[in-house]
Amino acid sequence: HNNHPRAAGCFSRVLGTYVREKGVLTLNEALAKMTILPARLLESRSPAMARRGRLRAGAAADVTVFDPATISDRSTIEQTWLESVGVHHVLVGGQVVRSAGVTDRSVRPGVPILGGVA
């Protein structure tokens, strides 16, 4: 159990606060920093990362569908479990874990991604 709001609201906070409200990043810049850029950085240590952070045939199909106009984090230090708003669908490895704003907590399709050591 992580007792910090970043556990539940990190990306939603960036998209809602720093992209939409403050305009610090463009949507494309923020999405790249959350997806393709970390995946590319880790590929040399973990070849499985070459299938992450991308939308293309043969990729892992980790996808989040959200509304840029409403996405926002709600978690706090006191209530770290509060889910973000504006996240409609989530697929992990191509399997639906959130549909129409409802999370299916019985589904756990994630897999460990292992890499070599330096």
Question: How would you label these PLM feature ranges?
Answer:
Residues 1-118:
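Active-site microenvironment of metallo-dependent hydrolases
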